[in-house]
């Protein structure tokens, strides 16, 4: 497994484009949630219903995980409210893309 983020990711434009194409095909209104994500909803106090598909289209990719040259997950940052952004890991290892985990961060 190889993880590209930050500077490593910025040097791999084709990988970013491929990850963006995968994200564009995801129906965020019906996105499945993993058990790991569901266990932490209360703890992390995040409501995915506040994140519209329009906000998802403007999301920033900050991490891509590869396994045998296949994208297995993409990390994105998306606007949550005026003070915070939601960081999400979307997994593509199964047939249906799923939210693996997410958390809130203060805007910088």
Question: Each PLM stretch: what is its role?
Answer:
Residues 1-108:
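Ribonuclease/tRNase effector modules and their secretory precursors
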